[in-house]
Amino acid sequence: MDLLAELQWRGLVNQTTDEDGLRKLLNEERVTLYCGFDPTADSLHIGNLAAILTLRRFQQAGHRPIALVGGATGLIGDPSGKKSERTLNAKETVEAWSARIKEQLGRFLDFEADGNPAKIKNNYDWIGPLDVITFLRDVGKHFSVNYMMAKESVQSRIETGISFTEFSYMMLQAYDFLRLYETEGCRLQIGGSDQWGNITAGLELIRKTKGEARAFGLTIPLVTKADGTKFGKTESGTIWLDKEKTSPYEFYQFWINTDDRDVIRYLKYFTFLSKEEIEALEQELREAPEKRAAQKALAEEVTKLVHGEEALRQAIRISEALFSGDIANLTAAEIEQGFKDVPSFVHEGGDVPLVELLVSAGISPSKRQAREDIQNGAIYVNGERLQDVGAILTAEHRLEGRFTVIRRGKKKYYLIRYA
């Protein structure tokens, strides 16, 4: 199976320009390609992951990827897929975000590969010094307003309005493609399905300035969920690639909770498992869905890819401890990850009666209720059921001297921190 055929089997091709020409080029030459990532936050998120991993797939097939950080375009704002005008971010903010995103992208590509090392570029390097007159003469002259108005990213904003700033975005992205074509021999741009208009604008600029040049575009479909909710969002917010914003445990849990209807598609999109391995998991899903083997494989592969082996091991340990109730063997760092979003209470002082702590931490509404909860076996301390209403929590109940985990009932957890 050639690269394009594999991408199609994985469901990673939404649209291409001249599919036959692109297949021929990929099969005959080492192709330089790029994908752009605008810094709209201080971290990339899992919505960016399909594009990042597609760059990696191209590199593994022998091609040369360029990850382009949009230090300049991030100052402007892409109207694609947006119903209203973006808020402009300060230059210093975008610079800081660009540096963070550059570091994140570096984890997924090989910069030492023999013959096809990856590169990371920042389009501020060439758009920043560009003066208005040069831009209008060398780029703007090649775009008619009629052509730009016909693009979906503009059409969708006709009613609500679009500023000249965002209207000009596609010309800046087109200029990126031309610049990389000239300086790096870049022949292919890939991006999300909402980037089709911007990608074809780049091809148009290359054609008008370079004649019948062979350059191509490929878009990746928008990742969807069978239940209709937005991919990459949970009740607690966006799933980020930065472990400080989304812990490896939360990240692992996101994937392990994948719907049966989505899991095989996600294995194709987000893992490097072979066709045979994925088909075996698909068969197991049909025959024994309760084992959730496909979800476990997905969660393990993607967590390892993004956060590494050790973070994966920690995420699995936390998951198993929470499932079994065996909290006492977790490290303080693992407890902090696993209980990041549960209610927490800071206890100042030494030993404390359990009844008193349950009330002061808001776990039980009154001392009477606290005693009832304890007597009824509803209170667990570090995974151990305590039914002694006279129990005193001492230093022995502090995990690594920092935390006590209290559970009320089957699932309601509370984290006690010690000042």
Swiss-Prot record:
Q: Pfam families per the record?
A: SYY_C-terminal (PF22421), tRNA-synt_1b (PF00579)
Coordinates of motif 'HIGH' region in the sequence? 39-48
Chain ranges for the short sequence motif 'KMSKS' region as given in the UniProt record: 230-234
Residues recorded as binding ATP, renumbered to this chain, are 233
Q: Detail which positions bind L-tyrosine.
A: 34, 169, 173
Q: What are the recorded GO MF terms, alphabetically?
A: ATP binding; RNA binding; tyrosine-tRNA ligase activity
| Ranges for domain S4 RNA-binding | 352-419
Keyword Ligase part of the UniProt annotation: yes
Q: Name one GO biological process term.
A: tyrosyl-tRNA aminoacylation
Q: Which NCBIfam families match?
A: tyrS (TIGR00234)
The entry's protein name is Tyrosine--tRNA ligase
List the lineage, top down. Answer: Bacteria, Bacillati, Bacillota, Bacilli, Bacillales
